[in-house]
Curated annotation (Swiss-Prot):
Keywords: ATP synthesis, Cell inner membrane, Cell membrane, CF(0), Hydrogen ion transport, Ion transport, Membrane, Transmembrane, Transmembrane helix, Transport
Gene source species: Albidiferax ferrireducens (strain ATCC BAA-621 / DSM 15236 / T118) (Rhodoferax ferrireducens)
Protein name, entry field: ATP synthase subunit b 2
InterPro entries registered for this protein in UniProt: Alt_ATP_synth_F0_bsu, ATP_synth_b/b'su_bac/chlpt, ATP_synthase_B_chain, DUF2934
Biased composition (Basic and acidic residues): 275-298, 306-326
Amino acid sequence: MLIDWFTVVAQALNFLILVWLLKRFLYQPILDAIDAREKRIALELADADTKRADAKRERDEFQQKNEVFDQQRAALLGKAMEEAKTERQRLLDDARHAADALATKRQEALRSAQRSMSEALSHRARDEVFAIARKALGDLATTSLEERMGEVFTRRLREMDAKAKAALGEALKTASEPALVRSAFELPADQRAAIQNAINETFSADIPLHFATAPEVVCGIELSTNGQKVGWSITDYLASLEKGVDELLKERDKAEPQSELTRQIRKRAYELYEQQGRKEGRAVQNWDKAESEIRKENLSPAKTEPPPEAKAKPKPEEPKPEIGSP
């Protein structure tokens, strides 16, 4: 069998043309469509991965924000509760302090009223006593008594200490006017001369004097010049006594709050004694307990000693201890 090479070549060429046509018009569009679909699927998968990552990130952020919010809410709630508790305690303390201050103020007002009345009575009694004393001494002062006062004055003038004597002598010597000598009664001439001689001898100079009467100089004589003064009279004794009484009253006023505290402790100790019954050694225990309770009311910071009757143990046969009346 002979091979027709022309036919073979033609068939091969025809096959190649067919393959090219199939590839050009059939396979290539299909491949292009497949590639396009693969690219679209890849893009969709990439977009899905991106969205999934974004969703996960947003979820994590949301969870973190929720945790932070819960922590902040718990912190704010705890802070609000603590502030409410603090404010409640502050209001209670303010109310307690206000009540304590009001009670203390009322007690202080009562003590002040009692103290004022006591002071008024004491001062009135003191003034009356001194007024009566001055009037009685003024009525009893006679001319003979004034003469005796003159002798005492001249003696004390000579017995002056050097410093006071020098100051008075300088004032007498430099005075532009006569020195003033005052007495309750008008001095006789001989007594004036005695006083003049005593002054001249004491200060070694001729000192001009002016004698005058002054009812307030009770039973005494007074010499004054240029702001310097020397003398002796019963009025000075009364003034010294009055000053001593004033100091005694001031000391009593200072000690009065302590006495008030002791009075209240006595009262409280007696109440505790009545509540607990009469037992051996109960008085001292009651005193310490009463003092502790009273000090909580801020009545006094000082330590108060129990009275002797509270320190001693009460006898069983006695009806009640001598703690003292409130």
